[in-house]
Amino acid sequence: MKTASIILAAGQGTRMRSRLPKVLHPLLGKPMLLYALEAARSASDYAPVLVIGHAAQEVRAAVESAGAEALFALQEQQLGTGHAVMSARLAVPEDADLVLVTCGDMPLLRPETLRQLAALHRENGGVLTMTSVVGDVPRGFGRIPRGANGSILAIVEEAAATPE
């Protein structure tokens, strides 16, 4: 089975309150996006598809100047995560059996984690396999309510979320 990857990097990052695109904020001397690209590339059989939108030229220039391997997909209007993934669909290789989707602002996501996620997906044969974080303070983030057996009931953006 062949694995492809999509990295979402089109958002504005308004919570950061910075003129610099969120994914270009430096971590240990390089933009955090480059860590996400390295992890995705390591876990994929192809160059990652990088979805860019807000400050697209600046993000693209940073990736290219670093010599990172990526294909670019433009999300002209930032209409959410699902729309960002759809913006990348034509750039994903046709022979890919599995597509990993991750975010460009996750510099601590390790290649091993992505490979394990892909392996679990293949073993379980699900339609969708995802990781999530259980946090103490949900403010500032969307929610993933789950059923009694741990199954995903929905993915809810923060603006539409309830305290539960």
Language-model features, listed with the residues they occupy:
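Conserved N-terminal catalytic core of the sugar/cofactor nucleotidyltransferase
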Residues: 1-4, 31-103, 108-119, 123, ...
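N-terminal nucleotide-binding beta1-loop-alpha1 segment
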Residues: 1-18
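Short beta-strand/turn micro-motifs composed of small residues
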Residues: 9, 52, 103, 132-133
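Conserved G/P- and acidic residue-centered "switch" motifs that form tight phosphate/ATP-binding loops
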Residues: 11, 22, 105
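Short N-terminal binding/cap micro-motifs at the start of the first secondary-structure element
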Residues: 13-17, 58, 139
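Short catalytic helix/loop segments, enriched in acidic residues and glycine
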Residues: 19-36
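Conserved beta-strand scaffold positions in the cores of enzyme catalytic domains, especially
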Residues: 24, 72, 128-130
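Conserved core of the sugar-phosphate nucleotidyltransferase
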Residues: 109-164
